[in-house]
């Protein structure tokens, strides 16, 4: 797991800037993204918080696909629980999510729509079975035009399981 974090730190160059306030903010349905988030948090000494859906997904792949497709088709994103952390206190946000439908998971859409990320540096990291980081990073840039989107890191789910 340390190799995964070191790759992220080298790619972003942000991990060495200790003056900045950092938050690891992530959504994880089955624990894979949480594993990566916790390693980043541990290595950086950053604060950490999970994004949680009010109505959790079941963890069943087919049920998640069915529900996720319906949410996307209707543009009705899942409600999320209020964050406990005050986002205004952070300069750098490591934003983690699994890849769903080629981009970030639906609860992240709700998060992006409900928070002010202006002036923040966002470092995306994702876990995926197929697909990867590029499309979700491009979508983050569109969704958060007033934030700086740094180069992020994508890791295959199978690689996280082996490293844990």
Enumerate the language-model features and the residues they cover.
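Hydrolase active-site cap/lid region
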Residues: 58-66
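Positively charged n-region of N-terminal signal peptides that target proteins for export
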Residues: 1-4
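FMN-binding flavodoxin-like domain, especially the glycine-rich phosphate-binding loop
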Residues: 8-12, 19-54, 66-67, 72-97, ...
């Amino acid at each position: 797991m340390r190799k995964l974090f070191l790759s992220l730190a080298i790619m972003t160059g942000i991990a060495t800037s200790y003056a900045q306030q950092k938050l690891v903010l992530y959504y994880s349905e089955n624990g894979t993204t949480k594993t990566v988030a916790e390693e980043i948090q541990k290595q950086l000494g950053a604060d950490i918080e999970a994004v949680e859906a009010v109505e959790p997904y079941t963890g069943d792949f087919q049920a998640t696909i069915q529900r996720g497709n319906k949410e996307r088709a209707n543009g009705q994103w899942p409600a999320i629980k209020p964050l406990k952390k005050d986002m205004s206190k952070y300069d750098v946000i490591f934003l983690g999510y699994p890849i769903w439908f080629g981009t970030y998971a639906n609860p992240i859409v709700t998060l992006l729509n409900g928070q002010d990320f202006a002036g923040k540096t966002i470092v995306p990291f994702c876990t995926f079975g197929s697909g990867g980081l590029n499309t979700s990073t491009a979508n983050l840039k569109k969704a958060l035009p007033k934030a700086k989107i740094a180069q992020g890191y994508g890791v295959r789910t199978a690689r996280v399981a082996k490293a844990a």
